[in-house]
Amino acid sequence: AASDVYKRQLLGGAHFWGYYPGKIWSQLICYLLLIPVKINGREKLHKRTSYVFVPNHQGSFDIFLIYGFLGRNFKWMMKKSLRKIPFVGKACESAGHIFVDRSSPKKVLATMRQAEASLKDGVSLVVFPEGARTFTGHMGYFKRGAFQLADELQLAVVPVTIDGSFEILPRTGKWIHRHRMILTIHEPIAPKGQGVENIKATMAEAYTAVESSLPEKFKGMVKNEDQDR
């Protein structure tokens, strides 16, 4: 009773503090740096539906673009190693973001259960399925984690294309360059069953959709040297 109310208050707090401060800060950064932002496809999403968003990972400014302009309350799913970063790891944990521990099937299952508890009433999940920023502007291969989670929870996967972040600050760059960013939200991919075949089909369809809105110069898969870590 009382403990359940307290838990709900904490959850509501995590939903607020884990999203809105980041959204406002991200919008402010883009406005202060005079970075134009264009959003395509928001009308494809239903307001109170939870999704698993899978964007490509062009650069550091991906975070500002998604936080500031996706227009959905969401949780990040991130690598367990990020939990060790001083202050950042604790802040992300307090905000209810989800760390993936792949050290055993039991830990993976625990991650899925945590996600299931968080993804209600339109709160969604954002995962970079490449697992690392690109060095070239091209997409690397997609890892299975986000798609396994969507399959387990029977949630629709939404492919998202980020374009322009690589030009602003590439992974090997030191200086910020003003450039327009475009966020393209593709049609949600509803589950077509459950299991390995659904996961494979969704991964392939999502990859094709994300790549379709990239400029020609960035089309074609180029594996990142640190994707397997």
Regions found by a protein language model. Give the residues of each.
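N-terminal signal-anchor transmembrane helix
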Residues: 7-61, 65-68
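Short, small-residue-biased leader/transition segments that mark boundaries at the very start
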Residues: 1-6
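Non-catalytic C-terminal accessory region of glycerolipid acyltransferases
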Residues: 109-229
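Short gly/ser/thr-rich secondary-structure transition/capping motifs
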Residues: 33-40, 108-109, 165-167
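Hydrophobic/aromatic ligand-binding patch that stacks against planar heteroaromatic rings
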Residues: 29, 66, 91, 148-152
